[in-house]
Design a protein with these regions (language model features):
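NUDIX/MutT-family hydrolases
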Residues: 102-106, 112-144
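Active-site segment of metal-dependent pyrophosphate-handling enzymes
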Residues: 69-110
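Short secondary-structure boundary/capping segments
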Residues: 13, 95, 112-114
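Acidic, metal-coordinating catalytic segment for phosphate/diphosphate chemistry
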Residues: 1-20, 93
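A cytosolic small-molecule/anion-sensing beta-strand core signal
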Residues: 25
Length: 145
C-alpha cells in the first residue's frame, strides 16, 4: 500500500483505474449507499481500485470478496469502460478521476453484505434506478444505451 501522502499526490495527479461489479438478480441491480467520498451518500454500484501489478481478474475477485462477501463462481460479463470525474475525493481540495471497467454478475441469493463502505444496500429495478435522485448519475450511465 502507498503512504497516504504519496497516494494523495497520485489522486491529485493521475486517473485511478477501478472495477465496478453490477450485481444482478433477475431484473434488479444491487446498489450500496456510499459512506466515503467521492459520491458520498449516493447509491452506487459495488467496486474498487485495481492495485499496481494486480491482474483485472484478481482485482475483481478481491473486490467481490471484500465489498460483497462473495467468491465469484463464474467470470462477470464485461459491460464497458467509463470515465468518472468527481470534484471531491477522500482528500480536502483534491478532485478524483476514475477510468472504470464495469462488469455484470448474476446472483441468485443475497450474501451477508459488509458495511465498511456502504451504510445500506437496496435492490433497484433498472427503470427505478434511472429515475431515482438517490442513485448517482455514473451508475445510470451503465444502463443508458
Amino acid at each position: 500500500m502507498l503512504d497516504d501522502q504519496i497516494f494523495k499526490t497520485v489522486v491529485d495527479s493521475a486517473p485511478l483505474i477501478s472495477i465496478d461489479i453490477l450485481i444482478k438478480k433477475g431484473n434488479k441491480i444491487l446498489l450500496g449507499r456510499r459512506i466515503n467520498k467521492p459520491a458520498q451518500g449516493y447509491f452506487f454500484s459495488i467496486g474498487g481500485r485495481i492495485n499496481k501489478n494486480e491482474a483485472i481478474d484478481n482485482a475483481m475477485a478481491r473486490v467481490a470478496l471484500n465489498e460483497l462477501n462473495i467468491d465469484l463462481k463464474s467470470t462477470p460479463e464485461f459491460i464497458g469502460v467509463f470515465e468518472h470525474f468527481y470534484d471531491d475525493s477522500m482528500y480536502e481540495n483534491v478532485s478524483t478521476h476514475y477510468v472504470n471497467i464495469a462488469y455484470e454478475y448474476e446472483m441468485e441469493e443475497t450474501p451477508d453484505l459488509p458495511t465498511e463502505q456502504h451504510s445500506e444496500y437496496q435492490w433497484f429495478a433498472i427503470d427505478e434506478l434511472l429515475e431515482s435522485k438517490q442513485v448517482h448519475k455514473y451508475v445510470k450511465d451503465y444502463f443508458r444505451n
